[in-house]
Amino acid sequence: MYPVDLHMHTVASTHAYSTLSDYIAQAKQKGIKLFAITDHGPDMEDAPHHWHFINMRIWPRVVDGVGILRGIEANIKNVDGEIDCSGKMFDSLDLIIAGFHEPVFAPHDKATNTQAMIATIASGNVHIISHPGNPKYEIDVKAVAEAAAKHQVALEINNSSFLHSRKGSEDNCRAVAAAVRDAGGWVALGSDSHAAFTMGEFEECLKILDAVDFPPERILNVSPRRLLNFLESRGMAPIAEFADL
């Protein structure tokens, strides 16, 4: 098991079922050292208000030896790469994930989907692209992976895509992983938990990575320090409370 999980949702996204405290308890039980809460951006119908993200600044950084990153799974809104995260939200957040969600950006043709994703990557506002292997959104995988490597944005392999949602993602995710490997980019693993019980579960992701001989040194979840070094290389100030994770 990797000790870092970068994608999960709380009851603030009302189709999810666990609280921050639930995730902390599960992290302690499973040996997770660092995790990110990434509730859906406010343009989703049942997402939290933007104040929810701004007020994450009141959270403790570490509880019982478990580090907590303040994050969002923002929505890609258009071909210009605009996302539903702005202003004071950026000031309060450590981790910005962004991806396609049908209520905000309906599936388009391959060229349009690719343009929107690459524009988001190039914007400098995003650390990780969520579930880029979604079969409903055809993309130019090679072009996206090369853009992500150039701009130091990780592409996610999402465990939930193989179990609960986005059925038919396997072939696309293998292609994404292979393209990131060839481009020298980063992969992020996400449980995409909507209930704390699945936190830290990456078994299906690892099957995808093993199938393409993906180099472990390019997986962000291997250690808290690797993930924090990545975020700091993207401009995040070092967080003193995380020094001993």
UniProtKB/Swiss-Prot annotation:
Pfam families: PHP (PF02811). Its EC number is 3.1.3.-. One of its GO terms (molecular function) is phosphatase activity. Zn(2+) 3 binds at E73, H101, H131. One of its GO terms (biological process) is bacterial-type flagellum-dependent swarming motility. GO terms for cellular component: cytosol. It is an enzyme of class 3 (hydrolase). Keywords: Hydrolase, Metal-binding, Zinc. Zn(2+) 2 binds at H15, H40, H194. It comes from the Bacteria. Its cofactor is Zn(2+). Binds 3 Zn(2+) ions per subunit. SMART domains: POLIIIAc. Zn(2+) 1 binds at H7, H9, E73, D192. InterPro entries: Phosphatase_YcdX_put, PHP_dom, PHP_phosphatase, Pol/His_phosphatase_N, Pol/histidinol_Pase-like. Belongs to the PHP family. Homotrimer. PANTHER family: PHOSPHATASE YCDX-RELATED. This is Probable phosphatase YcdX. It comes from Escherichia coli O139:H28 (strain E24377A / ETEC).
